[in-house]
């Protein structure tokens, strides 16, 4: 584990599936428009689906007093000519811990891991999520496009902003 302020950062593995499932479902329920998936879908998944997800990609967890308070994921791009890129996805910090450096610490951890293998990292963020957009800009991400009507929730459309940070 890596110390970051008062938070411990650690790679989440299959053994973390139960706590990962709990925080993931909390994220989907608390901020439904911020995620492409839905609570109603993932709440029915067996624990093994979360174990598989943890085995497939690089997930970082932020702990405070042994409680998982934040998560984020690094997903490599697969096509041969895109292997220099990875995506940071599924970023969530519990509301009581937002604005306290948790997301910043998780991004620093993921970017350090990504820099070992990738030249750049990408992310997409709900355009209406001003706090997240400001944070990502502060962390050095640059917007390069907007997808209009990227997601639809309760008959309302939401745009996504695409951002990139060059690591090399």
Regions found by a protein language model. Give the residues of each.
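Conserved GNAT acetyl-CoA-binding A-motif
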Residues: 107, 114-125
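Conserved beta-strand-loop-alpha-helix junction that forms the acyl-donor binding cleft
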Residues: 123-133, 150-156
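Acetyl-CoA-dependent GNAT
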Residues: 14-17, 21-22, 26-96, 107-109, ...
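Conserved active-site alpha-helix within GNAT-family acetyltransferase domains
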Residues: 100, 104, 128-146
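Terminal substrate-recognition subdomain of acyl/acetyltransferases
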Residues: 2-6, 11-14, 159-168
């Amino acid at each position: 584990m890596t110390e970051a302020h008062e938070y411990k950062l650690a790679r989440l593995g299959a053994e973390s599936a139960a706590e990962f499932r709990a925080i993931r479902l909390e994220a989907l329920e608390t901020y439904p428009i911020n995620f492409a998936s839905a609570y109603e879908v993932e709440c029915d998944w067996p624990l093994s689906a979360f174990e598989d997800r943890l085995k497939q990609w690089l997930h970082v967890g932020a702990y405070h007093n042994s409680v998982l308070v934040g998560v984020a994921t690094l997903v490599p791009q697969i096509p041969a000519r895109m292997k220099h890129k990875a995506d940071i996805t599924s970023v969530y910090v519990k509301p009581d811990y937002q604005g306290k450096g948790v997301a910043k610490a998780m991004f620093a951890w993921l970017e350090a891991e990504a820099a070992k293998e990738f030249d750049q990292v990408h992310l997409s963020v709900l355009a209406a999520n001003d706090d997240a957009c400001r944070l990502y800009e502060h962390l050095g991400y640059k917007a390069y496009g907007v997808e209009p009507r990227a997601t639809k929730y309760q008959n309302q459309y939401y745009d996504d902003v695409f951002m990139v940070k060059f690591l090399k």
